[in-house]
């Protein structure tokens, strides 16, 4: 009986501690993987227009803009072009920015999207985060009808937690010969 009382007391203490921590946050509402370092949700939403212009200033920016344009064209069927000085979506790469090499700042307003990064890697990760803000159908290789192409207005700042990326291969579950 004494052990049961101790067990019940422990369970109640755990339940009380769980209630002390908030279960939702701004980052949880956005659903980006990996979770960004800093996320501020703003009011409103960015509606992807029928004619999208993705602007850039560097060669890395051009490659990222082309990749993004190809994905958006395929899934939305919209007229997506790259180039120009001002676009609905702007990719700005500047080595003078004070952020980590692979860091970025993504600003989504009702008027447009701005991705700022120090390097092309950071801009690419910013573009990937923006794509995750759109409906999941954006990953479709064919045009998807009946989807409202909108993204929540927000301001996201992110950078990798570590300066390296890793890969783990479990040899127990992947049968590789000794040779």
Question: How does the language model describe each region?
Answer:
Residues 1-11:
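Bacterial N-terminal signal peptides that target proteins for export
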Residues 9-20:
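Bacterial N-terminal signal peptides
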Residues 26-162:
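Contiguous, structured surface segment used for ligand recognition
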Residues 165-169:
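Hydrophobic faces of well-ordered beta-strands that scaffold small-molecule active sites
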């Amino acid at each position: 009986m004494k052990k049961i009382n101790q067990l019940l007391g422990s369970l109640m203490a755990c339940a009380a501690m769980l209630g002390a921590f908030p279960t939702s946050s701004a980052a949880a509402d956005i659903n980006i993987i990996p979770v960004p370092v800093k996320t501020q949700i703003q009011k409103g939403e960015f509606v992807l227009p029928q004619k999208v212009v993705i602007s850039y200033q560097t060669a890395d920016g051009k490659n990222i803009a082309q990749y993004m344009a190809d994905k958006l064209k395929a899934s939305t069927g919209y007229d997506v072009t790259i180039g120009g000085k001002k676009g609905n979506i702007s990719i700005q790469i500047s080595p003078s920015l004070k952020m980590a090499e692979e860091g970025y700042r993504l600003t989504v307003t009702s008027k447009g999207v701005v991705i700022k990064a120090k390097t092309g890697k950071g801009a690419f990760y910013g573009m990937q985060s923006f794509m995750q803000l759109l409906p999941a159908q954006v990953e479709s290789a064919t045009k998807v009808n009946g989807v409202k192409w909108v993204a929540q207005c927000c301001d996201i700042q992110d950078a990798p937690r570590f300066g390296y990326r890793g890969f783990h291969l479990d040899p127990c579950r992947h049968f590789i010969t000794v040779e």
